[in-house]
Amino acid sequence: MSLVLKKSIDDVALKDKKVLIRVDFNVPVKNGEITNDFRIRSALPTIQKVLKEGGSCILMSHLGRPKGARMSDPKPEKGVRGYEEAATLRPVAARLSELLEEKVAKAPDCLNASIYVSKLKRGDVLLLENVRFYTEEGSKKEEEADAMAKVLASYADLYVSDAFGTAHRDSATMTGIPKVLGSGYAGYLMEKEINYFSRVLNNPPRPLVAIVGGAKVSDKIELLDNMLGRINYLVIGGAMAYTFQKAQGRKIGISMCEEDKLDLAKSLLKKAQERGVQVLLPVDHVCNKEFKAVDSPLVTEDVDVPDGYMALDIGPKTIHMYEEVIGRCKSAIWNGPMGVFEMPCISKGTFAVAKAMGTGTQKDGLLSIIGGGDTASAAELSARAKNMSHVSTGGGASLELLEGKTLPGVAILTDKQ
């Protein structure tokens, strides 16, 4: 999939236009404070482009998973339909104001914002409240999603999509609005995301390594199946590695294992061999008897995990082996951590992979792509994110791209003639 044949924000006049931009400001908030503003910062180039060209921005996003209310529900005496304090975009408006160094107005109800929109002048920014406060945003009933899309579309002259993180959703704000307006344009973040993934999937510098981790093989079946026809090396870590290792007859102690996926693991390993893909699995492990942080976890001498122990991270020999493979590759794509990186004593494997990719990018020109979600969080936590070619803002969307699927939020955008 590529954005080469889709129109972008550079292909349309923005002066004096009210531009409705679907962004992904689904950021972590604790006690009313944003703990990671990466997604907000990633949307700035598109917002600044509109302002520079003399347009005004109407921003819409979701945050969290509020229960939501229907458009037809009675309006409460105070407040707005579906409102939940934990999911308000108020902290986002404050942070965006700081980043833009100008006031960002906020409409408290995304579907009753006409008065706020009418006051917009050149260079103004308006943030609508959480679109998921209305259940129509994610409704599977086309008429419900269309009803919400029509209200939002009425605010604007143009629709721009910069929400790669929700591009895999067929929703009112991702596909409904461009359908109503008859056009939709890609923002700079959307364009950047798709083009990086397109490059690594369709025409990567070789050798190409896929580093795949996380808890379950079942979560990565389609990704692995699609990538085996494209990669030279497959590096496996995380809890999912132990399903593969048990399938090979190794001892895994009480490590997590999907017993019903052992035959699938064998099949994937056989397919990799048939396609000439070298698969690397852990050769030593950092273990504990319980799923908790300890000061001195057990590090095994070899590939087998002792009885009564569970593997929580890859060991030093495995780290060295994985670093060597990354070092000999020209492209690397990483989806899923190597272990429980949130616990400092068992974060070394994940952080070592991040360091190897960052170093390879800066010193040897490695094309390095981080596939969003937990992997992006790990790269940020390891302070290596800035060294990568690209850190995706989308977990589910990047996973579906790697699985070879078409993203509805991209497919709906206007084709170039």
Swiss-Prot record:
Residues binding AMP: A215, K216, K220, A239, A311, E342
Enzyme class: transferase
Catalytic activity entry: (2R)-3-phosphoglycerate + ATP = (2R)-3-phospho-glyceroyl phosphate + ADP
Pfam families: PGK (PF00162)
Compartments, record wording: Cytoplasm
Statement: the UniProt record of this protein carries the keyword DNA damage: no
Domain of life (superkingdom): Eukaryota
Entry annotated with the keyword Transmembrane: no
A GO cellular component entry from the record: cytosol
GO molecular function: ADP binding; ATP binding; metal ion binding; phosphoglycerate kinase activity
GO biological process: gluconeogenesis; glycolytic process
Name used for this protein in its record: Phosphoglycerate kinase, cytosolic
Organism: Leishmania mexicana
Gene of this entry: PGKB
